[in-house]
Amino acid sequence: MKVSIYGAGRVGVSIAFSLLHTSLVDEMVLIDIDKKRAEGEALDLLHSSSMFKSCNIWAGDSKDIEDSDFIVITAGRSQRPGETRLELLGDNVRIMKEISEDIVKYSPNSIIINVTNPVDVLTYFIWQFTNLPSQRVIGTGTTLDTARLRVLLSQQCGISPASIHAYVIGEHGDSEFVPFSNATIGGLKLIDYCKLCENNSEQGFCLNLKIIEEKVRKAAYEIIERKGATNLAIGAVTARLISSMWRNEKRVWTISVLVDGIYIGYPSVIGKSGVEKVLRLNLSEDEEKKFQYSRSVIQKSIEEIKSKIF
């Protein structure tokens, strides 16, 4: 397997390091505007690869992405003092355009995974710029948020996260939400499981769903406040996404996927060739309203970029 990663910052390197642990990667290319940094990170990763399957890792240029199985995008710049959100977004869309042109020129058969935020908006523009099948252009979406949710439920319920089927959907951002009506543990609705749980209250319900949902939504802010950035968990999640596709596991992930004309976090089956099926959830009336609102947030950003930048 060959993986090319645009962006050798903390997120890009965390993804690369997590990929080494899978022992599936034969070649890995790091591409960054700061070539010297990319070379240093590549060398450090190369030395660590001796602990895993042998992997050829180097800092390259756009042409080196040729014949990549997966291209991961973590590139982008941060907000400058006094700069508006739209100005920043416009610049990052332009960066995505340059990368998209590289992909079309050198490796048009790759599966593209975008990680750069706002992930849903930027993944949409990558899809537009490359004109590749949407099945092969995805974003990490709410996969990390879903992982956070399952950890919180696991701690509360005393059940392995692997046995908890609950998802965060919508925008990877403040409008994301949890459709708890679809959440299950061992085939039981989450609410029904709570009646059997040793932690249950007199009312037969041990979870404050609003608090858990808010903790998931605020998790990134909490981490950034303490360490300045989130990188390890998204690194693990992205590497797991790649290994899942490479092994053709056909697992369900809440990736950013094309749904009714825009990219948004939604449960989808992914395999060797990318997205195989988008699973339409049976949402409650309130959940449907939340989903449509989240969708409108993404749509608004897309329309702003189209009208003011291009």
Curated annotation (Swiss-Prot):
Beta-D-fructose 1,6-bisphosphate binds at R150, H165. Pathway: Fermentation; pyruvate fermentation to lactate; (S)-lactate from pyruvate: step 1/1. The modification Phosphotyrosine is found at Y221. Its EC number is 1.1.1.27. The active site is at H172 (proton acceptor). NAD(+) binds at V11, D32, R37, V115, T116, N117, T140. PANTHER family: L-2-HYDROXYCARBOXYLATE DEHYDROGENASE (NAD(P)(+)), L-LACTATE DEHYDROGENASE. This is L-lactate dehydrogenase. It comes from Fervidobacterium nodosum (strain ATCC 35602 / DSM 5306 / Rt17-B1).
